[in-house]
Amino acid sequence: MKEKLIAAAALAAISPLAFAQSSVTLYGVADAGVEYLNHANASGNSLTRLTSGNMSGSRWGLRGVEDLGAGTKALYVLESGFEIDTGVASQGGRLFGRQAYVGLEHRMGRLSLGRQQNALYDLLINYDPMVLGARYSLQMVDSSFVGRYDNMAKYTGKFGPVTAIALYSFARGTSITSGGATSFAGEVPGDPKSDQALSAGFDYSSGPVGMTAIYDQQQGTLGITGQNTSQRDRRIAVAGSFKFGTTGKLFAGYRWLNGDIGVLAGQPSKRSDVYWLGYQYQILPALSLTAAGYYFNDKRTGRDPWSLIGSANYVLSKRTDAFLNVGYARNKEDSNLGLNGFGISITPGNNQTGVMLGLRHKF
């Protein structure tokens, strides 16, 4: 009898370890399309090409969760971006360039450490009509909307309809090119501000209403010509959405930027505003139509480029959809907003029209 009691006590002591629940999930997105652009180079020539990561960046990843008991979980994410048209790694060739972090999660929130998305990316993806796609979306006018920072400590809390995010990056991993080689900035002894970043934001979503506000700050990086650690870029973004029943959704947002990273002495700061507006309509159970407009107000030059986007998305199955995007970017003087972003496949001062037909599969 005594031996049975001892055995039962021993089993009870180890059972939390023996029966801890854990899981590992392999997931990803394969997104490819054919795109036509005019005014794609300095000679004004057009371009037809196969592209990767259009509505969603092509990626694969591993997501792991372990139940530690008492409502606490350990977790990790390793996510790698790739170019489906060539097979090469994205994000500068990093193995896990999209995300790589480990953390703990409790009912009071999640604390995660590693390379992660900034608060702009986490929150604004729900308020861009084109969901921050790699092309033909809000990130055309500011690539920081899809920013990722190395060396980050991040808190995420969910409290009913409210989500709160606060993060600090010891060095966000800016690319540095020297002698033909590319490296990524890290922490610098004696200068903790080099390449530093911090960000915070909240989201409120209840019923048909959604709204968000975010602050993001980046410091200059040692090792890059024209930068120093006293320089900084500050962004504030606010956005909202409203659902009309089950068929329509309205989006609107604003981004303020003031900064001097990379600005030469005596030159004006990088002061600009971004405004966007869009509407998505579920015309059929499998077919949705989206229209969006993005306006970049450049306070330094007054060149103020803008773009208009139209998109149709047809769901083929639970995991596969086809899309058609049409876009127009308007420039004046030597502004260079293209449908893939500033200075990307666009001739300065010219307007650009683009069409893309693509296929996306999620696994």
Description of each model-found segment:
Residues S22-L37, L47-A171, S194, F202-G207:
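Outer membrane beta-barrel
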Residues V24-A32, A70, A74-L78, L111, ...:
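Transmembrane beta-strands of outer-membrane beta-barrel proteins
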Residues A32-N38, S80-I84, Q117-A119, P161, ...:
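Transmembrane beta-strands of outer-membrane beta-barrel pores
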Residues N45-T48, V88, L138-M140, S183-V188, ...:
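Extracellular loop and loop/strand-boundary signature of outer-membrane beta-barrel proteins
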Residues R63-D67, E105-R107, T156-G160, D203-G207, ...:
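Structural signature of outer-membrane beta-barrel channels/translocons
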Residues P189-I309, N313-Y314, G327-Y328:
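Detector for outer-membrane/organellar transmembrane beta-barrel domains
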Residues Y314-L316, Y328, T347-F363:
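Outer-membrane beta-barrel "beta-signal"
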